[in-house]
């Protein structure tokens, strides 16, 4: 049996950490492999043993290219991990003045008010670190959502 047949039969294989091939490709910064796996139909919402999805890894490693692909393919933006954190939490925490991934997640409906196991939200964290631009991105998203739900 050749390598291609093995990959096609086991595309959703997960390792000892519960990570699938897509998650490992993201961690390894192998975008071409990640794109190929998505195109082959890998589970884009697979959760590892810590509850991380491929989108969590994109947020952790600030990989906007694959995050955008996953969101366009319908990845669930608000899945929480074992700590109650959605991918937006990691994007906010790792932004370092680069707000592109945060804006992308917000555009696709990430919940900036989602409380984790410590009862803190991404917006709470932005306020704690006094990141005015981040606060504006997250707060404006929630104001728009509240306005639209009242229509």
What are the language-model segments listed below?
Residues 32-33, 65-66, 100-101, 133-134:
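Conserved ankyrin/ankyrin-like repeat signature
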Residues 24-29, 57-63, 90-98, 125-130:
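Ankyrin repeat A-helix N-terminal signature
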Residues 27, 49-52, 56-61, 65-76, ...:
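Alpha-helical adaptor scaffolds
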Residues 2-5, 9, 108, 117-120, ...:
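Ankyrin-repeat-protein effector appendages
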Residues 1-28, 35, 39, 144-151:
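Intrinsically disordered, low-complexity regulatory segments in ankyrin-centric signaling systems
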Residues 5-9, 35-43, 68-76, 103-111, ...:
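Ankyrin repeat domain, specifically the short helix-to-loop turn at the C-terminus of the second helix
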Residues 13-14, 44-47, 79-80, 112-115, ...:
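Ankyrin repeat boundary signal
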């Amino acid at each position: 049996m050749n390598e291609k047949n093995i990959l096609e039969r086991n595309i959703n294989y997960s390792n000892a950490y519960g990570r699938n091939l897509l998650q490992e490709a993201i961690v390894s910064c192998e975008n071409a492999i990640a794109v190929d796996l998505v195109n082959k139909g890998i589970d884009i919402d697979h959760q590892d043993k810590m509850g991380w999805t491929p989108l969590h890894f994109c947020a952790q490693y600030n990989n906007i290219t694959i995050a955008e692909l996953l969101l366009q393919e319908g990845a669930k933006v608000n899945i929480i991990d074992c700590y109650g954190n959605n991918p937006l939490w990691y994007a906010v925490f790792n932004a370092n003045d680069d707000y592109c991934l945060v804006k992308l997640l917000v555009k696709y409906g990430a919940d900036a008010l989602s409380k984790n196991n410590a009862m803190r939200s991404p917006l709470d964290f932005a306020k704690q670190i006094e990141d005015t631009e981040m606060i504006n991105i997250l707060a404006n998203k929630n104001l728009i959502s509240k306005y639209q739900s009242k229509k």
